[in-house]
Amino acid sequence: MAVTNVAELNALVERVKKAQREYASFTQEQVDKIFRAAALAAADARIPLAKMAVAESGMGIVEDKVIKNHFASEYIYNAYKDEKTCGVLSEDDTFGTITIAEPIGIICGIVPTTNPTSTAIFKSLISLKTRNAIIFSPHPRAKDATNKAADIVLQAAIAAGAPKDLIGWIDQPSVELSNALMHHPDINLILATGGPGMVKAAYSSGKPAIGVGAGNTPVVIDETADIKRAVASVLMSKTFDNGVICASEQSVVVVDSVYDAVRERFATHGGYLLQGKELKAVQDVILKNGALNAAIVGQPAYKIAELAGFSVPENTKILIGEVTVVDESEPFAHEKLSPTLAMYRAKDFEDAVEKAEKLVAMGGIGHTSCLYTDQDNQPARVSYFGQKMKTARILINTPASQGGIGDLYNFKLAPSLTLGCGSWGGNSISENVGPKHLINKKTVAKRAENMLWHKLPKSIYFRRGSLPIALDEVITDGHKRALIVTDRFLFNNGYADQITSVLKAAGVETEVFFEVEADPTLSIVRKGAELANSFKPDVIIALGGGSPMDAAKIMWVMYEHPETHFEELALRFMDIRKRIYKFPKMGVKAKMIAVTTTSGTGSEVTPFAVVTDDATGQKYPLADYALTPDMAIVDANLVMDMPKSLCAFGGLDAVTHAMEAYVSVLASEFSDGQALQALKLLKEYLPASYHEGSKNPVARERVHSAATIAGIAFANAFLGVCHSMAHKLGSQFHIPHGLANALLICNVIRYNANDNPTKQTAFSQYDRPQARRRYAEIADHLGLSAPGDRTAAKIEKLLAWLETLKAELGIPKSIREAGVQEADFLANVDKLSEDAFDDQCTGANPRYPLISELKQILLDTYYGRDYVEGETAAKKEAAPAKAEKKAKKSA
C-alpha cells in the first residue's frame, strides 16, 4: 500500500510496529543470516540503483554512486558481520555484570537527495543488524531511488526470514508527512542525514535523534607535504560524485613556501584557476539569497562555469578560486557540495591552521578537517592540528570524501554514511554512526562485595625492652640521619635520649624536634617540616602518644612532598580507594618509625592522623595508607610511669577503637579477631594497669599490646560516629580524646544497636543491620552473658560492664561533669552535630546518621541521660514536668 497521506502513514507504522515486535525476538544467528542476504542484494543492485539516483536527482556521477552503493553494502557488512547485537553481549563473572542488547524499536530514516541510495542501504542494513525496523522519509527529488533501494533490501530480508513489513517508506514525501513521521508516538529514534533544516527538525521533534552537521572541510598543506599526493588526493575526493559528499574538501590552505608549487600542480592536473571576472561570476553563482545555490550541487565543473556565464573544457575537474577573505562574506569559504574549491595562502603552518579553524567555525564545525604533512617526521604538527581543530574526523594525508566515511584509508575509522559532528555541530554523537548507536544496552549488575585488605607496618616490635633491638634495624638498614619528633615532656624526661644514644653510638646523626603539643596544630607541623627540609633525614622517628605520631606523619608528607596542599590531604572520601585526592608515594626520602609511649591511640600502626588548624580550631582527621609507619615499636617499658588519667583515657580509647572496628561496615574476619582479642585483654588487664601502674608490669604490657592490636583492627575496619563526635568535642572544648570517647561510647552503642535504623550505611558487604548482633557477640566473647540470654540482655550487660569500668577509672558521668558549661555546649551543639556528620569516621558507622540523631546523642551524653530511640530532647524535658503535674493533680 502506497503512503501518500497521514492516514496511510499511520497504517504503515502499525504494520511496521507489528513486524518489529516479531523481529525483536530473533536470535543472533537469524539476524546475521538476514543481514548477509540484504547486503548481498544491495551490492548486486549497486549499478541500477546508481543510475536511478543520478537520473532522478540530476546530481552526481553514476560510476561514483556505484562505489557508494557498494561501500554501503560490502564494507558495512564486513565491518559488522561478527558484531554481537542480540541478547547477551558480554558477561564478566569477576565483577558480576551481564550486558544485554535490546533493539530501539522503529527508526525514522531521513535520507538526503545527494546520497539517496547508499544512505538508504546503509541505514537499512544497520537497522536489520540491530533488530530494529525503519521507515524512510526520502527527499522528494530522489524518492523513487531511495524507496527502490529500501525495497531491494526488504525483499532480500523477507526471503531470508524477516517479517514482511520490517522496512517501510513514504511514497509521496512532503514536509507534512515527514513531520508526522518524526512526531509519531511509535517512532523511537530519528536517524537524520540531510540538510541543516531537516536535521534541526529531527532534533526538535521531542524524540531521540542521531543527526549530522554541515561539512565545510578545510585542508592544510604544509611545506613538508608530498605535494603530488596532496593534490591528487584532493582532486580525487573533490570530484567524487561531483563533490556531494559532506566530508569533501571545501578549501585548501597552503603554506606560502609551497603555495606556487601546489597551485601549478592543480593547474596541470585538471584544476581550473579562476581569474578576474570568472572568479566574481562563480562567487555570484555559489550562493543564492545567502544560502547554497541548489543548482550547482552535484554538477560537473563545466556546467557550473556555464551557470556563471563562461565556458571551461569539459574535462575540467574543479574550479579553484584563489581568495583571501575567511568569513561569511566570501562565497568560496562556504560548503559548496560541488567541484568548486577555495584556495588560501598562509604565511606559515600556524597561520594555515588558524585559517582552517576559522573556516571550520564558520560552517563545518564538528565535521571533518584534513592535514597534508610528513606524518612520520612531523608528529608535533599532527598533534597541534589535532588539538586545534574542532572536528570529529581529523584526517592526515587522506582524501576527505573517501577517508571521512571510514575503513578505506584508515581501518580503525568505522565505515558509515552518517557522520556525527558532536555538540559542536549540534549532534548527539561525535563519531561515525554504526550498529552500536541503534541498540539499548541493559546492564545486569549482581551484588558483589568490596575487595578488602589488611594492611600493617612492615615490622612491629613488641615486648619490654624491644626498643634498642628494633633500632638496630635502623642502623643495619644503613640510615645516616634521623629526625626524632616528640613533645617537650618526653624530651625533658630523657625518653628521646633512649633513641639518640643508640643511634649516635652507631654513627647516625640525629636531630630532635620537641615542640609538639597536645592536639598538634598545622603551624607546629609546618615548623617541624621546615626542620626536616633543612636537616634532610633519611628516617623520621615519632616518639610519644597520638599527638607526636600524628604530627610526625604530616611532617613526613610535607617533607617528602612539599608541594602538597593540606586542604587536599584533609578532603573527605566515601571509599579510600576511590578518593579524588590520591596521597603521594611515601618513603622516597625517609622511612617512618613510630615509637608509642601511651597505651590507646594505636597511631603507631594506623594510616590515620589528626591535626588541628590553629587558624580555625577545626580538627582534621586524615586517612590514607600512605601514612602507615614502616615500623612500629611497642615497648611497654616506655609506659610504666604513665599517669593514671592517661592510662584511663588511653585504655578507654582503645576499648572504643575495638568496639567501633568490630561493628564497622568494613569489619572483616581479619579485623574481627584483633578487635575481640584487644577487648579481652583490656577487660582483664586495664583495671590493674590503672590501679597498680608499674607495680604490675604484666598488666601495663598487656594493655599496651591491646591498644596496638585494637589499632590494627581499626586501621583496616575504620571507626564510627563515636570518634566523629569525640573529634569535635575535643576540638571545641579541649576534652582529651580518650575521655571524649569514654563519655560517648555507651550512648553510641544504644544508638547503633537497632535492627531497623532510620538509615543503614551503604556498603556492599554490609547487607543488613548487624550492629545489635555484633555487640551481643562482644558480650559473649568477654564472658558477660549467661546461657539463654537474649540479644537485648547481652547488650545491657555489655553496657553495664562499660559503665562499671568507666566509674572504676574515674570517668565523669557526663560531658557536663567533665567541665563543659551548659550555655557554651548548647550554643555549639548544632555545629558540633553537623561537623561530626562530616567527619571522615562517620562513613564506616553501621548506622548512617541523621544530623539530628547525632545532636540527640550529644545532648543525652551532656546531661548524663541514656539515649532512647525516638525520644527527642523536647520529649525528655517535657516528661518530668508532665509527671510532676500529674502528681499534683492526684494530690
From Swiss-Prot:
Active site, UniProt feature: C246 (nucleophile)
Region (Alcohol dehydrogenase): 449-891
Activity regulation behaviour: Formation of filaments, called spirosomes, is critical for activity. Filamentation is essential for substrate channeling between the ALDH and ADH domains and efficient coupling of the ALDH and ADH enzymatic activities, and for the regulation of enzyme activity. In the absence of ligands, the spirosomes are compact. Binding of NAD(+) and Fe(2+) cofactors induces conformational changes and extension of the filaments, leading to the activation of the enzyme. AdhE is inhibited in the presence of oxygen by metal-catalyzed oxidation (MCO) and by heat stress.
Region described as Linker: spans on this chain: 441-448
EC number(s) reported in the record: 1.2.1.10, 1.1.1.1
Pfam families for the chain: ADH_Fe_C (PF25137), Aldedh (PF00171), Fe-ADH (PF00465)
Matching InterPro entries: AAD_C, ADH_Fe/GldA, ADH_Fe_C, ADH_Fe_CS, Alcohol_dehydrogenase_Fe, Ald_DH/histidinol_DH, Ald_DH_C, Ald_DH_N
Family: In the N-terminal section; belongs to the aldehyde dehydrogenase family.
Protein's name according to its UniProt entry: Bifunctional aldehyde-alcohol dehydrogenase AdhE
